[in-house]
């Protein structure tokens, strides 16, 4: 009676499994840290315990941190240079018109991490949303533009009163505002962007 011989592939796979098991056991028993002389760690702060399980707080994924909104310096370039982050202006029609800045983030409570819990992160766009929807404003402009409702909605109160008193500039101002709104020339007065509808 002869025993069946397993295929060579199974023997090789079993040998690799044993080799992996022994290497894992031997690496867990190692007590002295391994030094790597060719690594440059000057760019990142050195953690307290390099063999520990904690990750630097600044390396945490987005779901484990909460970030503030970008700081509004209201056009003050000196304040932006002193703080080294924040926005001089908000909004823009094209990607190139929008400033980008870092924001202050904090690790959430209950998340264990190494290093300072507050840090600067990201390249966030200087955009704010204040509840202005393009389609709503376009409908206001089309149906009630002669009464200045579109300008009131966007916060341009002075020109809205003038448009109301002249009944949309006898239709000319109504038509011009409709074209300006469609082409992006008429935006909210607080420099916010249009809210998107998903």
UniProtKB/Swiss-Prot annotation:
Residues modified by carbohydrate are 29, 40, 76
Q: Name one Pfam family in it.
A: TM2
Location of the TM2 domain: 131-179
Q: Where in the cell is it found?
A: Membrane
Major place of residence? membrane
Tell me how this protein sits in the membrane. Multi-pass membrane protein
> This chain belongs to which protein, by name?
TM2 domain-containing protein 2
User: Organism, per UniProt?
Assistant: Xenopus tropicalis
């Amino acid at each position: 009676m002869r025993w069946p011989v397993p295929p060579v592939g199974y023997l090789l796979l079993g040998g690799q499994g044993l080799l992996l098991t022994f290497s894992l056991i031997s690496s867990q028993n190692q007590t002295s840290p391994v030094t790597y002389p060719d690594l440059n760690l000057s760019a990142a702060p050195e953690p307290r315990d390099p063999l520990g399980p904690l990750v630097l707080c600044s390396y945490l994924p987005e779901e484990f941190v909460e970030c503030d909104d970008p700081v509004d310096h209201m056009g003050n370039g000196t304040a932006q240079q002193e703080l080294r982050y924040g926005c001089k202006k908000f909004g823009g029609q094209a990607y190139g018109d929008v400033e980008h800045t870092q924001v202050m983030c904090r690790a959430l409570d209950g998340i264990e991490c190494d290093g300072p819990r507050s840090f600067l992160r990201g390249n966030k766009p200087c955009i704010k949303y204040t509840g202005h929807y393009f389609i709503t404003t376009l409908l206001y402009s089309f149906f009630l533009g002669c009464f200045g409702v579109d300008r009131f909605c966007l916060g341009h109160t002075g020109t809205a009163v003038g448009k109301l008193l002249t009944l949309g500039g006898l239709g000319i101002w109504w038509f011009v505002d409709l074209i300006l709104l469609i082409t992006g020339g008429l935006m909210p007065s607080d420099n916010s962007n249009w809210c998107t509808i998903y």
